């Protein structure tokens, strides 16, 4: 992709004059001011589309409760839907900013959880496709800056991760939470106009006219993919609400999985002119070019969600008196966002110096997995240690995430960059949805299990009659205020036992996340080094 009016402004003979000209690797590449402006607009469009995620994560449960639907928040966390349909052929990103703009307005004006969910679905559709900025932006720059381009694409996301939880909580407490969406809608609209006037995608490398592209799209494949992915993800969400053997869980999971198998068979044996997921992309170099790094990308994203679930729970349960000290809770939420930014900056500054990209990916994933798994040794008193572990784990995540995206881009030919982006985005967000459901289900089940083990025996030892254990269990998770009818000794014993149950539940989730992390490490070891592709040459095709 490129800014089509920029060609005349590039210095004659510069390394970026034409994509096919020989490139002097000893000369630093020239990138014009318009390219940087468009790069920043692309970054803003993506980051602004991501803003609702940390906002909803911070205050979604409270908003749902205030609107009279305490369980509605479950669906607000499942908004990112990344279609791969035609992303290799239809790639003008300004339209997606407009979609996000509409979604933000719907949420900001919401009077019910259903309207919030509807708005998040709209903005999620646009936002999941806005993540194509991670592919559109780096190809404007020389290949050796590919990892830096991915970091720049997420630059506004860092701001969202760090600031949005703060503005969300303050906005909720002050009754102005909707401005988290009104404000973002304004800037998303400005991003739309910026891309509309300054960014013009080049001709597709396959030379396919838009009319032919629409005719040649794999509509049956798209139908099968959507028809399988939607019920499958619904089943995963229901697993956090119903028992695992309930029809609400089993039926959509089975139907969704069966349809996805049909989708895979259709893509593999359908003899399609332009398949959504070309098999040769996955099979290249026995999967080492693209399949291994995209698996690593999905697992890295899965590991992020374990920390995003465990750390807020630890803050609420152990460090802020059940969330009563919400200002201190906001402060404790900052290390995670700053750590991701720090890891991304380390990649930007040292990636090209260290080279050996596949070993960088392996090392950063190793750091993420080790320190993320060590969150499982939490106690109510080791706050400093946990802050250090969450920072180190998320710094590893920041390095690994953007490097894995860059390596997936390098694993395909330029003509398949849209396919790579669509598949990578689908796997990234689907893995996140699966991980979120697994972690939440494991956490809630483990907490219930260990609460039933530790609390009754502790309370009885403190003098509680066995006949009152059932009544105590009904209110123990609501805090000391709900246990006023019990003696101080019983309350203290019950709270200590409940803290122990929380520690055990967190440990189990940390071990589950470690299992995923080991899978990610195996995928990293299978990746190929892309150093030979890190050249001064940009992967762009300009309009003539």
From Swiss-Prot:
The keyword Transmembrane helix applies. Belongs to the major facilitator superfamily. Residues 1-28 are annotated as: Disordered. This is MFS-type transporter prx5. The chain crosses the membrane at residues 36-56, 90-110, 116-136, 148-168, 178-198, 221-241, 249-269, 290-310, 330-350, 361-381, 387-407, 418-438, 505-525. MFS-type transporter; part of the gene cluster that mediates the biosynthesis of PR-toxin, a bicyclic sesquiterpene belonging to the eremophilane class and acting as a mycotoxin. GO terms for cellular component: plasma membrane. Keywords: Cell membrane, Membrane, Transmembrane, Transmembrane helix, Transport.
């Amino acid at each position: 992709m490129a800014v089509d009016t920029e060609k005349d402004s590039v210095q004659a003979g510069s390394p970026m004059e034409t994509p096919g000209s020989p490139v002097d690797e000893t000369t630093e590449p020239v990138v014009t001011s318009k390219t940087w402006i468009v790069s920043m607009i692309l970054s803003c469009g993506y980051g602004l589309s991501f803003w609702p995620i940390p906002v909803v994560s911070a205050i979604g449960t409270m908003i749902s409760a205030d609107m009279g639907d305490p369980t509605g928040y479950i669906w607000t966390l499942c908004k990112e839907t990344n279609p791969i349909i035609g992303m290799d052929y239809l790639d003008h990103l300004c339209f997606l900013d407009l979609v996000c703009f509409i979604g933000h307005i719907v949420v900001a004006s919401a009077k019910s959880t259903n309207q919030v969910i509807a708005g998040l679905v709209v903005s999620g559709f646009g936002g999941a496709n806005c993540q194509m900025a991670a592919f559109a932006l780096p190809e404007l720059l020389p290949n050796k800056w590919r990892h830096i381009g991915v970091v720049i694409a997420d630059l506004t996301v860092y701001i969202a991760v760090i600031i949005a939880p703060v503005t969300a909580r303050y906005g909720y407490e002050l009754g102005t939470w909707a401005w988290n969406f009104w404000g973002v809608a304004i800037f998303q609209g400005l991003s739309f106009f910026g891309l509309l006037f300054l960014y013009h995608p080049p001709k597709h490398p396959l030379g396919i006219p838009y009319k032919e592209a629409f005719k040649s799209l794999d509509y049956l494949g798209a139908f099968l993919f959507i028809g399988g992915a939607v019920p499958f993800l619904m089943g995963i969400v229901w697993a956090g609400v119903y028992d695992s053997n309930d029809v609400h869980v089993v039926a959509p999971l089975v139907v969704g999985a069966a349809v996805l198998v049909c989708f895979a068979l259709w893509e593999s044996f359908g003899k399609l002119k332009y398949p959504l997921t070309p098999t040769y992309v996955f099979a290249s170099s026995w999967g080492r070019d693209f399949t291994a790094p995209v698996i690593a990308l999905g697992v890295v994203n899965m590991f992020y969600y374990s920390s995003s679930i465990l750390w807020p729970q630890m803050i609420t349960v152990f460090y802020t008196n059940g969330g009563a000290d919400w200002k201190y809770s906001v402060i404790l939420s900052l290390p995670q966002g700053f750590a991701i930014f720090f890891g991304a900056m380390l990649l930007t500054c040292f990636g090209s110096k260290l080279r050996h990209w596949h070993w960088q990916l392996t090392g950063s994933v190793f750091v993420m997995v080790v320190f993320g798994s060590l969150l499982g040794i939490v106690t109510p008193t080791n706050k400093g240690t946990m802050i250090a572990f969450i920072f180190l784990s998320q710094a590893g995540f920041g390095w690994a995430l953007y490097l894995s995206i860059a390596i997936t881009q390098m694993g395909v030919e330029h003509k398949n960059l849209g396919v790579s982006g669509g598949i990578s985005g689908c796997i990234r967000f689907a893995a996140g949805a699966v991980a979120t459901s697994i972690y939440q289900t494991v956490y809630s089940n483990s907490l219930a299990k260990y609460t039933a083990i530790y609390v009754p025996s502790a309370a009885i030892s403190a003098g509680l009659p066995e006949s009152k254990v059932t009544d105590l269990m009904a209110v123990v998770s609501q805090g000391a205020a709900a246990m006023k009818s019990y003696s101080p000794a019983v309350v203290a014993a019950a709270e200590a036992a409940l803290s122990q149950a929380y520690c055990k539940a967190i440990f189990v989730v940390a071990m589950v996340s470690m299992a995923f992390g080991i899978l990610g490490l195996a995928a990293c070891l299978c990746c190929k080094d892309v150093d030979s592709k890190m050249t001064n040459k940009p992967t762009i095709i300009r309009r003539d």
